[in-house]
Design a protein with these regions (language model features):
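Catalytic His-Asp segment of secreted/periplasmic serine-dependent ester chemistry enzymes
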Residues: 5-115
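Long, charge-rich low-complexity segments
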Residues: 112-126
Length: 126
């Protein structure tokens, strides 16, 4: 298993294109969620995952719906933590068991870039 396929039923209305789906989510966040004033912050986990998909990381989902239990969840957690606390996640040195040095670097890069530009995918340098 691995990343969602173009014929995945949830992506059908977006032509099987994850980036189109991401753009629609970002648009809704900017036009509906944030202007509502009901939320303190945005945790752009979807953007972080899309950022990671531009890297050499490989699959980030385990069954087309759920993030991998190691690096996928770590990216989401880093993004949530950084967005919620405002702390600089590039200073984090810890990674869960099963996340190697390369995955760690990609996770930090992907999450930090998502926090910096939450509505735009940032191509990885890794």
């Amino acid at each position: 298993m691995g990343e969602p396929e173009k014929n995945h039923p949830e992506l059908a209305s977006f032509g099987g294109d994850q980036l189109k789906l991401h753009a629609k989510i970002a648009e809704m966040m900017q036009t509906i969620i944030i202007p509502s004033g009901e939320f303190c912050c945005v945790a752009p986990m979807g953007t972080a995952i899309q950022n990671a998909r531009t890297s050499t990381l490989g699959p980030i989902t385990r069954d087309y719906y759920h993030l991998t239990k190691d690096v996928g969840r770590y990216i989401a957690g880093l993004t949530f933590f950084g967005a919620l606390t405002g702390l600089d996640i590039t200073n984090i040195k810890w990674a869960p068991e099963g996340v190697d040095e390369k995955q760690f670097a990609i996770a930090i890069e992907s999450a930090a870039n998502a926090i910096k530009t939450p509505f735009e995918v940032t191509p990885s340098k890794l």
